[in-house]
Amino acid sequence: MYIKSVHLINFRNYDDMYLELSPNTNIFVGNNAQGKTNILESIYYSSIGKSHRTNKDKDLIKWDKNNTYLRTYVSRERLDKTIDINIFKNGKKAITVNKIKIKKISELMGNLNVVMFSPEDLRIIKDSPGNRRKFLDIELCKINNVYYHDLVQYNKILSERNTALKNWNNRINDIIDVYDEQLSKYGAFIIKERNKYLDKLNIIGKNIHKKITNDLEDINFRYLTNIKDFDNAEKELLMLFKKNRKKDLERNSTSIGPHRDDFEVSINNIDTRIFGSQGQQRTAVLTLKFASLEIIKNIIGEYPALLLDDVLSELDSNRQKFVLNSIDKIQTIITCTGIEEIDKYLDKKQSQLYLVNNGKIKKV
């Protein structure tokens, strides 16, 4: 799988930009705030229907325009895909794949698979559990439509349960009983799928991490949840909801469930979030991203596109070398302010260079 072309109209700082991409390595070079990341953002949006930078779709529209248009042409082994997206300032959007209207975001996912690595991804390791849950949810939604459906349903019912906890009456226990049964069903599936994904990360990620660190470090991923027996997760979750109901009524919120879960990343049995150096934390994220690439490849039979947003300059030479030596079978789109540091590791015959300046792109 690879992206053949991207066409943007009124997207961020682009008026009307058509770009053909190499199936190998594409490098966009330019100063900051020229539009390099906007290219990656448009591709990422075409993949999952969301931006990695903003929750407001209207932010993607050029400031003096009423709508933006994105077209991404994707070459697949079985069937090529043309993804068209119109986003309007009133909050509406229209998406088609091969001219067929998409009604749900789950129908968009899987047509264009990408893995993005940006400096902000250090938050997966360093910051709150929400960042780690988000990572798991996005990666699982790419490869599992049932997971996406159950996650949406879980969050919807969770919101309704929390509203009921804030506005309870003498029928509150009957109402919460219904919510708890539904949450247990969807929540158990989410927990089990997250745990399975982390098992895959452990198998694949350990080998990747050893390559990056020359066998000096061992990485491990461990799911942190209240559930002890994954085979009976639904029953156990229902029991925990009932056990914590009094506390939930006092706090007006749901205190346990997959929306509270986390996962631990340890290197040589030490918690990387608390005790890891910045270099170790970057390496852990690198391992997560490259393991995610392999998991997608194993499931769908094709590598996703790899988007590297200004991250190579933050890696030392050993990690730069690992990245650039690992992408020969993967379409990779790189943004950077200069290629001097990575030039010696690039395969010139497999690389296409572009210069980006104030929303204009020049192929070199």
UniProtKB/Swiss-Prot annotation:
SUPFAM superfamilies: P-loop containing nucleoside triphosphate hydrolases (SSF52540). It holds the Pfam family SMC_N. ATP binds at G30, N31, N32, A33, Q34, G35, K36, T37. GO terms for biological process: DNA replication; DNA synthesis involved in DNA repair; double-strand break repair; SOS response. The keyword DNA damage applies. Transmembrane segments: none annotated. Its main location: cytoplasm. Belongs to the RecF family. This is DNA replication and repair protein RecF.
